[in-house]
A protein has these predicted regions:
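Conserved redox-cofactor binding core of oxidoreductases
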Residues: 2-157
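Glycine-rich loop(s) and the adjacent beta-strand/alpha-helix scaffold that form part
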Residues: 107-114, 126, 154-222
Length: 222
């Protein structure tokens, strides 16, 4: 129902992937077919707000060009020296990407998380909803056991944003919180190494704010 709603009412479009569930071996888990990604998006659709979209992480691009592992991109790039079809495909992709860099100084056709952010931003902007950047969340506003908004920071100091229908903390987990991941991941407890391509600033602030507001956090990955 959620996917149908977003595709019907917003700019969101999804495509299936070949990814397994995170835990395909548990009851109800599936080895393939359930996961979806945002459909690739041309960010010129954002108009004057296009420069506000943060570029993708360099670690998941090739000279700034994004791939979508659910389509033919990776297959062709792996086979471009073995197949004429793949060679032509890769050549066209590279030429188009170089044009984008020359004209816009960044990739225009984005995939995965960048496409998700761009499509959600386009949907919000079309509805007249302001998108505040450089406005870090400070704490969840809690009155009489009810979440009523967020306190945020900014150039003019802290201010409160009130919410009548709830608050969504979409903060990307806690991949750079050394103490928390040490408790959460069994491979670290057994002496293994943990590497993440996420920004170093992604230290779990959202999780801590939720806990402070009284939320239950389950760190079991089993």
């Amino acid at each position: 129902k959620m996917v149908d709603f977003f595709e019907r009412e917003t700019e969101m479009k999804f495509i299936p992937t070949l990814y397994p569930d995170y835990h395909p071996d548990v009851p109800g888990g599936a080895p393939i077919g359930r996961s979806i990604l945002a459909q690739p998006y041309d960010i010129r659709g954002l108009g004057k707000d296009m420069p506000r979209l943060k570029p993708p992480l360099k670690t998941i691009t090739f000279i700034g060009m994004m791939f979508n592992s659910s389509n033919a991109d990776l297959k062709h790039f792996f086979q471009f020296t073995k197949s004429l079809t793949s060679f032509v495909y890769v050549a066209k992709r590279l030429v188009n990407h170089i044009k984008e860099l020359a004209l816009y100084q960044r990739a225009i056709n984005v995939t995965s998380g960048n496409a998700l952010a761009a499509r959600l931003a386009k949907s919000a902007l079309d509805l007249g909803i302001p998108i505040l950047t450089s406005t870090p969340a400070k704490r969840v506003l809690n009155e009489n056991g009810q979440v009523v908004g967020m306190q945020v920071g900014g150039e003019g100091g802290d201010c409160d944003i009130r919410a009548s229908r709830g608050v969504v903390l979409a903060c990307g987990g806690f991949p750079q919180d050394v103490q928390r991941i040490a408790k959460a991941y069994p491979h670290l407890q057994s002496g293994g190494e943990h590497l993440s391509p996420t920004p170093e600033t992604n230290t779990g602030d959202g999780v801590r704010m939720a806990e402070t507001a009284g939320a239950d956090v389950d760190l079991r990955f089993k």
